Amino acid sequence: MTDHDLTLTDDPTANRQALEQLLTTATGGTLRLPAGTFTLDRGVVLGSGWTLRGAAHGDGPVTTWLTSSSPDGEPVVHVLGSRVTIQDIGFLPPPCAPGEHGGDRGTAITIGNYLYPAETEWIEDVQIRRVEVERRDERAANCVAVMGAVRDITISDVSIVGGCTGVAVHWGAVGDGVDSIVGPSYHPHHLSIRDLRVSDAFEGFYLSSVHDVVVDRVHLSDVEIGFRLLPGDNTDRFHSGGDNPVGARIRVSGAHVGWNGPLYAVRIAGWGRSEIDQTVRVLEYRDVVVRDCTFVPLPLARAGTGDPQRSRSPIVVEQASGVILEAIRVDLRVDPTATGPRHDDQAEVPAHQPAGQR
């Protein structure tokens, strides 16, 4: 693999073309970006075998920042290949309002896709390390999205300020739209999220219709919702994973959540209502554990949003049999500076289990 040192300027079109010239003509390697803040006129796609790396910054904050001037809602970086690494880069995504089913749009980084025109190959072995995302005062679009046919993904030491959901992990499927899915469906798995920090966002992270996932050492502060474990609106209706059932082998540990929304810090739901025919299905969770977590209710971020007839709940569980809650702490002292709980260094992503082409 070849290393490439890129020169970027204040010309958004030239910057994007410099990246694309290498990404479309070479067969992989490392693209090293200089320190500074650089604008692209639209997002770029990373295919297989590429590392996108910012300038060295020691133990301090990142010194390379990318943004986009595009109003079209594509990710700043869209990963559509395997063996990809993105590290030591900050992202400033432009404002975007992708709508209820546009969770993979308007992001800093999206890995994979939500909807596919036909059966697809898996994207695997992707690492996101030492990345920062800022979209202050803007909560309509997600920051990092992991979608569909993706597996063996590592997200570590990521810091996010603002946005809708910090890290959104969502199933995908073959279909023209959410109400016309024909399957098969694809469910992210063998995913590790560690040392994630999200603040001033609507939500820290969610996992929708996944299996074999470890989340450890996360600090979510000033968020309306901490995190959600969801079955997906079609649960496993279009899934044919054999020994890899959806909703199996999920660990969330070492989470500190300071939430300022009117409802809950955490929601764990087993039921989903299909957008295709409105039928309700219930997913059976297997070997799912949430442990060693602390939840701190903060004053409401928006006055008047709470229902005086309905109390705020640290955890809401809805038809989610098979889930274990262990060593859960609720801190009513309202101290957002408190350190997180002890973490679980023994939690590991299970060994790869082939899911086959679904």
Predicted regions and their residues:
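Acidic Gly/Asp/Thr-rich repetitive segments characteristic of extracellular carbohydrate-active
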Residues: D3-R32
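Glycine-rich phosphate-binding "P-loop"
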Residues: H4-P12, A168-G183
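Leucine-rich repeat
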Residues: N15, L19, A141-N142, D277, ...
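Extracellular beta-strand-rich solenoid/capping regions of secreted or surface-exposed proteins
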Residues: E20-T27, F38-R53, P61-D88, L92-I123, ...
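Short glycine/acidic-rich loop motifs that flank beta-strands on beta-rich extracellular proteins
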Residues: L40-G43, P61-T63, S69-P75, P95-G102, ...
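Right-handed parallel beta-helix
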Residues: G49-A55, S82-P93, E121-R135, V150-C164, ...
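Leucine-rich solenoid repeat scaffolds
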Residues: R310-R358
